[in-house]
Amino acid sequence: MPSSEVKAGVPSKPEGTQTTHYSVVDADGNAVANTYTLNTGYGSKFAIPGTGVLLNNEMDDFAVAPGKPNVFGLVQGEANKIEPGKRMLSSMTPTIISKDGELRAILGSPGGPTITTTVAQLTRALIDYGVPLDQALPAFRAHHQWLPDAIFTENIIPADIEAELEKRGHKLMKRPRIGHANSIEVDPATRGFRAVADTSRAAGKAAAY
């Protein structure tokens, strides 16, 4: 094939630029929920010489300027200002759920400040409403972070919910996706595992062996 006919391919799913989450469980029920991040695209834009490993810019999760928004629009105060010996306030929420000592689920997500609401909504769907994670993950999500005073919603928000929120005076700000959860659910009756990747929002995969 002539070089002039070689074209760039079209990715089937957009690749995430920062945070990654994975959930793992073995045959004995030993579980790991791991969320790690560069924070923003290419992190600090500095690589460890000779390794190609990028360093993150998690310093932005501190209130670099208390009272002013960070890169995600979060406005924080003096309690989260940069000081020696402190760990910055992070939204990363790797989660393992158990009941009576038995593993029930493993989940987490990228998404900056939307991570906590993504994990909370999935946990409530599973625990409070008994919705399996393979049904809960594709459902629409919403997020509020105090400032701006608006509810971020996904474009797939049902029309009746959108109308009801607007009727109550909420300002809605739509975005293509919120979060990108990856999870494993344990059937409480059979103790079997169900791995679910949030493939409706971005690239991801559930695998078992």
Language-model-detected regions and their locations in the chain:
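C-terminal catalytic domains of large/alpha subunits in multi-subunit enzymes
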Residues: 1-16, 26-28, 61, 81-91, ...
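Internal maturation/activation junctions in enzymes
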Residues: 1-38, 47-51, 58-59, 65-69, ...
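Glycine-rich phosphate/pyrophosphate-binding beta-alpha loops
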Residues: 23, 35-47, 94, 109-116
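Glycine-rich, flexible loop/turn motifs
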Residues: 38, 42, 51, 78, ...
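Active/binding-pocket-proximal capping segment
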Residues: 38-62, 68-71, 113, 122-126, ...
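Catalytic core segments in nucleotide and nucleic-acid processing enzymes
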Residues: 119
